[in-house]
């Protein structure tokens, strides 16, 4: 039996949770995952600004009742999600927010566009997790 890549495991978990639509901006950290989306039945909606992606995801989920995903890029892309994520939180809209982070060995040292994401979103989400070991990705997204 062939081993799954981290990207394949991540997309499989998205499918398990019924994610069919993702909104946002894809950068280099997310490209290997987005390459798998079409075959997995996930439509990615590229937007001009991460804030727009978050607002569209919130609206889509409220209108359809189906959870969607928001993708952002480092630094300003992440901070641009504050308004839509807080709006979704206040409206009890289930969203999955996926953001990249500085490399593990540079975290806390002012890495390129590093943002304290866990602290930034702690009052805006019901659950959050930071993945530092790619081999644990499927465990984190299948645990409550």
What does each of the following model-derived ranges do?
Residues 50-54, 134-139:
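A short acidic, often aromatic-flanked loop/helix-cap motif at beta-alpha or helix-coil junctions
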Residues 7, 81, 137:
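Aromatic/hydrophobic pocket-lining residues that form the small-molecule binding cavity
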